[in-house]
């Protein structure tokens, strides 16, 4: 998920500058339209990059996003949390636990049921919160991408189930950063890797209390914990992208934007909570401010519920 306030135009301008600086990178042809540059592909962090090689042939759906042939996550998707760092006494564990326990089957998450695979099988829209564990700084306080994968591997080796239909979230406390660009390039990301012979989908989401101006929508929040409430929207963003584009080769547009990227930092109609903060949905007994997601129907549009 890209930073707050970083517009699509700025993201693309920055990527094009990098491409121009690397004169050895060829301009690739579009697989469907000769003479047109190729679709960019997602990097799981909120913007697209040039494909390193041949990509799946896009099947335009007329809804502003195309299917590229890769798998999607069917049936009930498992969510697993790895609480990295120091979360002692922090209400984030209950706020985000309640999010994972109630987002499945909600009008919000049913937006993802508008996505299907090449066999005409649709995302179910069901989610189950299946487990969590803690990691007290095993990889230090500045995590490389490799270290984040190691955190996931260690959690699996320590007892979390190896679930090919699950998404594992590495949730870091505010004293932890990610050296590849947390707070400077992104607020969260998702990817996948073969771990112990299983295709594991996992995500990094940092605590936006570390950089409120970049990764928090508001500093007063409906659950009284701005960092956790900010993480809730980022977790939702990465979860819906992992479900519809788990291996970064399924659903995205010609800029390399996945479904949630297309609606990042937009929230639709909001209401005011008693403490003055804004929220746009209720999941279980809690109010949340969660970004909109892209509906893959009726021409495509951002929404907080479907149908």
Annotate each predicted stretch with a short phrase.
Residues 1-9:
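Bacterial N-terminal signal peptides that target proteins for export
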Residues 25-153:
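N-terminal carbohydrate-binding/catalytic regions of secreted carbohydrate-active enzymes
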Residues 75-79, 106, 163-168, 198-201, ...:
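Loop/turn elements at helix/coil->beta-strand transitions in domains of secreted/extracellular proteins
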Residues 8-17:
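Bacterial N-terminal signal peptides
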Residues 233-245:
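Active-site recognition of the HExxH zinc-binding catalytic motif
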Residues 19-23:
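Sec/Tat signal peptide C-region and signal peptidase I cleavage site
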Residues 185-229, 245-307:
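Metalloprotease/metallohydrolase-associated module, dominated by Zn2+-dependent proteases
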Residues 124-193:
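Active-site-proximal segments of metallohydrolase catalytic domains
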């Amino acid at each position: 998920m890209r930073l707050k306030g970083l517009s699509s135009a700025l993201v693309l301008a920055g990527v094009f500058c990098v491409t121009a600086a690397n004169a050895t990178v060829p301009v690739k042809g579009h697989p469907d339209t000769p003479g047109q540059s190729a679709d960019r592909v997602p990097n799981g962090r909120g913007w697209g990059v040039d494909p390193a090689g041949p990509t799946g042939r896009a099947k335009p759906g007329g809804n502003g996003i195309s299917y590229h042939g890769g798998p999607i996550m069917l049936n009930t998707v498992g969510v697993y949390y790895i609480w990295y760092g120091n979360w002692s006494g922090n209400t984030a564990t209950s706020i985000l636990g309640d999010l994972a326990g109630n987002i499945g089957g909600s009008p919000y998450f049913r937006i993802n049921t508008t996505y299907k695979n090449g066999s005409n099988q649709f995302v179910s829209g069901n989610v189950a919160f299946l487990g969590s564990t803690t990691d007290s700084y095993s990889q230090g306080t500045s995590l490389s991408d490799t270290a984040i994968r190691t955190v996931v591997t260690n959690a699996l080796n320590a007892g979390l189930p190896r679930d090919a239909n699950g998404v594992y979230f590495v949730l870091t406390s505010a004293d932890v950063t990610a050296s590849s660009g947390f707070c400077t390039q992104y607020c969260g990301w998702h990817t996948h890797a073969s771990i112990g012979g299983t295709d594991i989908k996992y995500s990094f989401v940092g605590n936006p209390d570390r950089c409120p101006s970049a990764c928090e929508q508001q500093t007063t929040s409906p659950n009284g914990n701005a960092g956790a409430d900010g993480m809730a929207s980022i977790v939702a963003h990465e979860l819906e992208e992992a479900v519809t584009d788990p291996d970064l080769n399924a659903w995205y547009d010609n800029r390399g934007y996945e479904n949630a990227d297309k609606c990042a930092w937009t929230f639709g109609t909001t209401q005011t909570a008693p403490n003055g903060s804004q929220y746009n949905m209720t999941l279980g007994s809690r109010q949340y401010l969660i970004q909109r997601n892209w509906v893959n129907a009726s021409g495509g549009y951002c929404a907080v519920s479907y149908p």
